[in-house]
UniProtKB/Swiss-Prot annotation:
Keywords tagged on the record: Carbohydrate metabolism, Disulfide bond, Glycoprotein, Glycosidase, Hydrolase, Polysaccharide degradation, Secreted, Signal
Transmembrane segments annotated in the record for this chain: none
Species this protein is from: Aspergillus oryzae (strain ATCC 42149 / RIB 40)
Compartments, as annotated in UniProt: Secreted
Active-site residues from the entry: E196 (proton donor), E309 (nucleophile)
Name of the protein in its database record: Probable beta-galactosidase B
């Protein structure tokens, strides 16, 4: 974009520009509402809530990926503490609907209502995205797996069968959400219809309507409205290739109130090659030039530039690196890319993900394994990583930068800068004249150190800044936002080359926090005051003060930590380096999401500050501490005592409204050793004398499939979903008669999704496995009977155990799972007498509704409940107390189980993860070369919290949260180990403490209701 002529012609006075700009824009951009309420409005610039403009900075988490309702508060408090104004969630139709006509919004984490009440209590706006399709790398994209049979049509269209199937969920979830809308004194501000569904047009250029897609979207909107949803309806387009659902483009059926677009400029997966068709060649930090400005100008010119999903990280696919791919998605990514969005005048952002969580059970799509850490700012084990803090220094700023919610982009050029390697975008509020200059490398992959000055336009004329001090520095993959005419309380910052972090008005005086990395220079000018002094006694100041007639300029070289400058009128300027800014908290004394600067205390030092409350003269703070920490608190002078996590602290100093104290100590916790393992066979089904007559078994009798990919006609339908079986490991048991000229082989064609595998037995003899790969979804293979003994006088029994990785996303949700073709091969003509399939306990009528419907598969150990607390493991064999390994001799499946007590002291947040390893004589190469060919499942108190495929997926650490773990009681740990080789398998299981924090959060909550135990009915599924 060309730089504004106003700037090029000498940077004319801001005052004259402001008047013209305001006049033009007041007539150009209409203010919209949805015709039902004006509580939430919007225009070209931003959203308005209750008449006040907001820069909406949000982030996503999924309650169904952390199935402990008590921990949702922990996450929301961490989101609030960082300065986010909002958060977003997907709901999950499949999680709430185990079978047609059945909905569960009550059991355990299925009851998500507390999230909405917490949003109100804590003070966060909420964007809710109920689907019915959500993608999210969830199994079938969040659709119920009973819809994947083909019986409901192609899905996500106006097929009456599909609409009838989704209506109970859609109507009920709308009713549940409606009382929590902002129109009903709740905090839900936006309601999303569908997800990344760019299906309004058959032809984008001619706007030939896609009637099916339009009617589908309109149906969802109508049902939502009929059931109480009167908040604005939104939609997120998947990329900038489509132009659907915008009222600015057409009045076509299905339009939503506000349209947005999702963006993953690096890649949505750690395997960046998968994004080449959308993003082009991957070059780290290059994709900053997405044409958001021109795209929004075409798509939604009278609506805010809105990104319902912007890259908060990437998922780790099967075969991806251990621990994910945080390197190119770390603090530098957050610093550079999120400021770049601001430079493009985006005023509503939601990071995907802010907390990723865990694909426990079979929640994952076929693309990913157990971890959904996503390299998010809040890690899978709930730890705040450096990326969180680097994001926080921006979200704290956008929350108090009220003028940022209405800006025009006047230019973007290297001509603002004295250094041609540095580009600057100018944003200016047309009403107030406040401006924001976003600086970054002209060639964004560059990580060089660049120094420069910037030409700015201020209310006091054109300036080149800094005026006195050393030049501004960009060091590496960094961006800086330089403000001019920035309001903080009643004061105005004429300019600052140090970034604004936050401010508060305390006792009628402003406290402004600025930050710049250690060793770099900063300079600021405050209007309306003409003197300043360095207020840190005992510390050497590297600071210059330049008084003016009606302002004062301070130039400084940033030292390590925090310093304080006092202006002549009592205004205080806090100078912070990056590390100090990371732990500098702006904590409101109320729960108003819009609170910006008033009713706030500032706290420097702790790992986390969750809340602040002023009761009389007692200041009560809550939060978390990693170790002994020096803390400074900017609070009213009336404060007479400070309580931290309910305990009165010893105040070292309380001068000038700054209270200093020391908090915490070195908290420690040691885990007991995991021992006392017992073991039993978990594949009795291969034995010839096994009777497949329990309630676990269904006889395959269906001859015609509803799936668009029909199976071979020589057998009944063997797709698991058409037999009411949906997730996990599946067991087929087929019989065929003995003959004089018996078959010599069996041909199998099986589809199970990426990373799936299967093993085959004949008459108890192992005849082979398909080990699987990270990318292969289907395999056909012929297995010889040469290693098995065929029966001469009775039926032969063929057993196939398959690992159903998951259902695919989008249109691929209909891809079948199970056996497409099973054919006996030999000199004669053969057919199977009967096929049976083992289902999970209860099939679609789950015996364990708290953990259902995506937790359990069909292994014997799961069906009878060996993985559950309270199971009497009478058939078990003791594992040697000297053994550090769990072993399976030969090919087969065994279950290992033990019970380990925990006793975590009150006041500690102890994060625990399990580590599974499988020794081999090679590293991660190929399945064939890996000598420990196994698949294992980790169960903790009944929850499947780890899928371990060492030769395919490289995840070895599996965090398990409190609530799933009993922190003050016995914990049932079970591991099923499936050896896919005659050589047998060996696995090692251990656990580790990831971190220990002193916390105000009650981790000793009663989570027993989340861990229901074994019931007698399980025996019926043996």
């Amino acid at each position: 974009m060309l730089i504004s002529k106003t700037v090029l012609s000498g940077l004319a006075l801001g005052a004259s520009f402001v008047g013209v700009s305001a006049q033009q824009n007041s007539t150009r951009w209409p203010l919209h509402d949805n015709g039902l309420t004006d509580t939430v409005e919007w225009d070209h610039y931003s959203f308005l809530i209750n008449g006040q403009r907001h820069f909406v900075f949000s982030g996503e988490f999924h309650y169904w990926r952390i199935p402990v309702p008590e921990l949702w508060r922990d996450l929301l408090e961490k989101i609030k503490a960082a300065g986010f104004t909002a958060f977003s969630i997907y709901n999950h139709w499949g999680y709430h609907s185990p079978k047609p006509g059945v909905l569960d919004f009550e059991n355990g984490a299925h009851n998500f209502t507390s999230i909405m009440t917490l949003a109100k209590e804590i003070g966060l706006y909420m964007i809710i995205r109920p689907g019915p399709y959500v993608n999210a790398e969830a199994n079938a994209g969040g659709l119920p797996l009973w819809t994947t049979t083909g019986a409901y049509g192609k899905l996500r269209d106006n097929d009456p069968r599909y609409l009838e199937a989704l209506t109970p969920y859609w109507a009920n979830i709308s009713k549940i959400i409606a009382p929590h809308l902002i129109t009903n004194d709740g905090n839900v501000i936006l309601y999303q219809i569908e997800n990344e569904y760019a299906e309004q047009w058959l032809d984008e250029e001619t706007h030939e309507p896609n009637t099916s897609g339009q009617e589908y979207m309109q149906y969802l909107e109508d049902v939502a409205r009929e059931n109480g949803i009167d908040a604005p309806l939104i939609h997120n387009l998947p990329n900038m290739n489509g132009h659907s659902w915008s009222k600015d483009l057409s009045n076509a059926t299905g339009n939503v109130d506000v349209i947005g677009v999702d963006s993953y400029p690096t890649c949505w997966t750690c395997n960046v090659s998968e994004c080449a068709s959308t993003n082009g060649e991957y070059i780290p930090y290059l994709k900053l030039t997405y044409p958001q400005i021109s795209y929004f100008k075409e798509l939604s010119p009278t609506q805010p530039s809105f990104m319902p999903e912007f890259q908060g990280g990437s998922y780790n696919p099967w075969g991806g690196p251990q621990g994910g791919c945080p390197d190119d998605l770390g603090p530098d990514f957050a610093n550079l890319f999120y400021r770049n969005l601001i430079s493009q005048r985006v005023s509503a952002i939601s990071l995907y993900m802010l907390y990723g969580g865990t694909n426990w059970g079979w929640h994952a799509s076929t693309d990913v394994a157990t971890s959904y850490d996503y390299s998010s700012p809040i890690s899978e084990n709930r730890k705040l990583i450096e990326k969180y803090y680097e994001t926080k220094v921006l979200t704290q700023f956008t929350k108090i930068a009220q003028d940022l919610s209405k800006v025009d982009r006047l230019g973007n050029s290297t001509k603002y800068s004295s250094n041609p390697a540095v580009s600057v975008a100018e944003l200016r509020n047309p009403d107030t004249g406040a401006a924001f200059y976003v600086t970054q490398h002209e060639y964004t992959p560059s990580g060089t150190v660049e120094k420069f000055t910037v030409k700015v336009n201020t209310s006091e004329g054109a300036l080149t800044i800094p005026q006195y001090g050393s030049q501004i520095t960009l060091n590496g993959h960094q961006s800086k936002i330089i403000v001019t005419d920035f309001k903080f309380g009643s004061k105005t910052l004429l300019y600052s080359t140090a970034e604004v972090l936050t401010y508060a008005v305390i006792d009628g005086k402003e406290v402004l926090a600025l930050w710049v990395p250690t060793g770099e220079s900063g300079e600021f000018t405050v209007k309306g005051v003409n003197s300043a002094k360095f207020a840190d006694k005992g510390r050497t100041a590297n600071i210059e003060i330049h008084p003016g007639t009606n302002n004062v300029t301070v130039s400084f070289m940033q030292r390590s930590g925090m310093s304080l400058v006092e202006l002549g009128d009592g205004t205080r300027i806090v100078l912070l380096d990056r590390s100090a800014a990371h732990v500098f908290w702006s904590t409101p004394l109320n729960n108003d999401p819009a609170e910006a600067g008033n009713n706030t205390v500032l706290v420097h030092g702790p790992y986390l500050v969750r809340s602040a409350k002023l009761e009389g003269c007692d200041l009560k703070l809550t939060g978390d501490i990693q170790n002994s920490t020096e803390v400074s608190i900017f609070a009213p002078k009336s404060v007479c005592s400070v309580n931290w996590n309910g305990k009165k602290t010893s105040v070292k100093s309380a001068k000038g409204g700054v209270i200093t104290t020391t908090l915490g100590g070195d908290a420690k916790f040691e885990l007991p050793t995991i021992s006392g393992w017992k073991s039993a066979d978990s594949l009795p089904e291969i034995a010839k004398d096994y009777s497949a007559t329990s309630k676990a078994w269904v006889v395959a009798t269906k001859t015609n499939s509803s799936n668009p990919t029909p199976p071979a006609p020589n057998n009944p339908v063997l797709y698991v979903d058409e037999n009411d079986i949906h997730v996990g490991n599946h067991i087929y048991r087929a019989t065929f008669p003995s003959t004089d000229e018996p078959p010599t082989d069996v041909y199998l064609n099986i589809t199970g999704g990426r990373a799936f595998g299967y093993s085959v037995w004949l008459n108890s003899d192992f005849i082979g496995s398909w080990l699987g790969t990270a990318t292969t979804e289907q395999n056909d293979q012929t297995f010889s009977f040469s290693n098995a003994t065929l029966s001469t006088d009775e039926d032969n029994i063929l057993v196939v155990v398959m690992d159903n990785s998951a259902h695919d996303l989008r249109d691929g949700a209909l891809n079948p799972r199970g056996i497409t073709n099973a054919t006996l091969i030999g000199p004669g003509s053969y057919s199977f007498t009967e096929w049976k399939l083992a289902g999970n306990a209860g099939f679609e009528d789950h015996l364990d509704p708290v953990r259902a419907p995506l937790n359990e598969g069909s292994l014997y150990a799961e069906r009878v409940g060996i993985h559950l607390p309270g199971y009497e493991f009478d058939e078990a064999e003791e594992v040697s107390s000297n053994s550090t390994s769990l072993t399976v001799p030969g090919a087969g499946i065994r279950v290992f189980r033990t019970v380990v007590p925990l006793s975590v002291p009150q006041g500690l947040d102890v994060s625990i993860s399990f580590r599974l390893t499988a020794p081999s004589n090679v590293t991660f190469t190929s399945a064939e070369g890996y000598t420990n060919q196994l698949r294992a499942l980790l169960f903790v108190n009944g929850y499947q919290y780890g899928r371990f495929n060492p030769y395919i997926g490289h995840q070895i650490d599996f965090p398990v949260p409190p609530g799933v773990l009993d922190y003050n009681g016995d914990n049932t740990i079970a591991v099923t180990v499936w050896s896919q080789s005659v050589d047998g398998a060996e696995i090692k299981v251990d656990w580790n403490v990831d971190y220990v924090h002193e916390t105000s959060f009650d981790m000793n909550f009663d989570g027993a209701y989340l861990r229901p135990g074994w019931i007698e009915e399980r025996r019926e599924y043996a």
